Amino acid sequence: MNIGIVMKKYRKIFIMLFTLLAISLTAAASWMEKPAVRDIGDKIQFYAFDVGQGDSFLFILPNNETILIDAGPEEAGRKLVRELKRLDVKKIDLLVATHPHSDHIGGMSRVLSNFPVGKVWDSGFIHGSPYQKNFYSAIQKKNIPFGRPKRGHSENMGKVLIEVLAPARLIRGTKRDANNNCLVLNITYGSTSFLMLADMEREERSTIGPLPGAAVLKASHHGSSNGTDMSLLKEVRPSLIILSYGRNNSYGYPHLEVVGAVSAIGAIRLDTKDGTFRIVSDGEKLMWPKEREAGKNGG
């Protein structure tokens, strides 16, 4: 018997078996990394995406319908689409453009080209930017139902209530009119509310009146002091506050006044600059990644 030939034969078999094992382990790891999005029971899931300096948030409702609020800047579009597909999102039932700034709608074209969309809500503020024109063109081309809801409008998606708090009317003559005409939403499941302030500033806030209490607050305008302050935080009394901003951004977000106010009221702060995270609620209790609380791990 030629020992060399036998050893060569077994070496080939070993390489084949090792390759198959590696493929199997890779597939298993890929499967395990993917959250069991559709199998968590009667709960609402909220994802705050890390899109750099911008906003993008996903709700997966107990009935498996989805709400995507904003899509971040254009350069984050591919990453956002990958994240949505990783979460096994097949359709966006409600796509919300809170206002036409590029850090909120820059990624919309990629979303619209990768997912069917049930309907679109828009703030109604005409900015005239190429991003907004492309967004409107894609909606029209796909013949997607389109609305510009105002304060007082509400809809139910299964057991979830979506309330429009603003805009109440068109606001002109401010430093940032687009921000002061944002779609501001309160999304409620059971006794848990998510107050989504977009980039609302003081002028728009004055049209709303007292803000509702909410367990989760998406702080206005990336943690800018012209959107979130102590009086607002005392009105809302959130347990969790989300600050959506990019690492080392040129605007200095979040402003120190906001960071101090959040700390003073004792709320837990979660920042998107540290990466995408998920909050889950059964309508009463909130679950969030404790390790992501600001102040931990150098955050």
What do these predicted regions represent?
Residues 2-299:
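Non-globular, low-confidence helical/coil segments that flank catalytic cores
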